[in-house]
Amino acid sequence: KPGHRVMPDLVGRKFTANEPNRVYVGEVTYLPCKGGKNMYLATVIDTYSRKLAGYALADHMRVSLVVDALAHAHGVRGSLDGAVFHSDHGSVYTSQAFRSYCSSLGVRQSMGAVGTSADNALAESFNATLKREVLRDRKVFDNPIACRQEVFRWCMRYNTRRRHSWCNLVAPDDFEALTSATLTKAA
């Protein structure tokens, strides 16, 4: 498409970072509701702690959805200057508007190869976990409002209370607090 550009892969399936706020991954996933409607969730996940630093949920998959998710992460982190944001080749991520927004924040874009979920495995895994834990045995949300409420509740719990194997079985927020204290002492 005119104005769309694929960016190089700066992550190379290494979904780690030495400190918070350096490397993020994200993706858009659909959340099915009764009546055939979908909601769409865009995520921004820190590879250091697996913290969901930003997200946006809407009934559309326009560029504003991923811009809102990155804006949320910017608000949570205070700055994203110098960070890498890794995604797939979705048109919302290759768009001029998203590229410009990343540039305005000092974020470098990174993209995996086409057609391989392994190149964004961390974001894919997050979405699978969210759907499994929120929907449980259901196939769809009752309605968009219920979807928003349940996803919001789960996202808040994910960062503050859900233990994560990557984080030595503590929640992402606790992991960052513990490791930032260690990093400060080491400096």
Q: Which residue ranges define each predicted feature?
A:
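Charged DNA-binding/catalytic regions of mobile-element recombinases
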Residues: 1-187
